[in-house]
Design a protein with these regions (language model features):
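A cross-family signal for N-terminal binding/gating loops and helix N-caps
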Residues: 2-111
């Protein structure tokens, strides 16, 4: 992901950026560009909406039930992707945030 601003250089956001609680990271991702190179083609879009999920006490968070095979990525190192399939038709992308061992992630809700 790269910041999207006319007066800021376009750089890859370092993993250290994600080493904070999800509610702090989520609004700062809005306006960033998500880029992927796929089969030699550059695919990109601007992040327009995010949602923060923070810890087992967050009842909307997958980790509310604790550590399971499905939620294990949320407990991992910040800056990694947590991707899952839902409703039998959608793949959802999240950026893992906070310290390793703390289940937190930001859902990329709009691109």
């Amino acid at each position: 992901m790269t910041p999207n601003s006319e007066n800021k250089p376009r750089v890859i956001i370092p993993r250290s950026f994600y080493d904070r609680p999800a509610p702090q990271v989520a609004p700062q991702l809005v306006g960033c560009r998500l880029v992927r190179i796929y089969n030699g083609r550059r695919l990109a879009g601007l992040i327009t909406e995010t949602e923060a999920y923070q810890g087992e006490e967050d009842l909307a968070c997958h980790a509310r039930v604790g550590l399971t095979p499905r939620t294990e990525p949320m407990y991992g190192p910040p800056g990694h992707a947590y991707i899952y399939f839902t409703y039998g038709m959608h793949w959802l992308l999240n950026a893992v945030t906070d310290k390793e061992g703390v289940p937190a992630a930001v859902l990329i809700r709009g691109l």
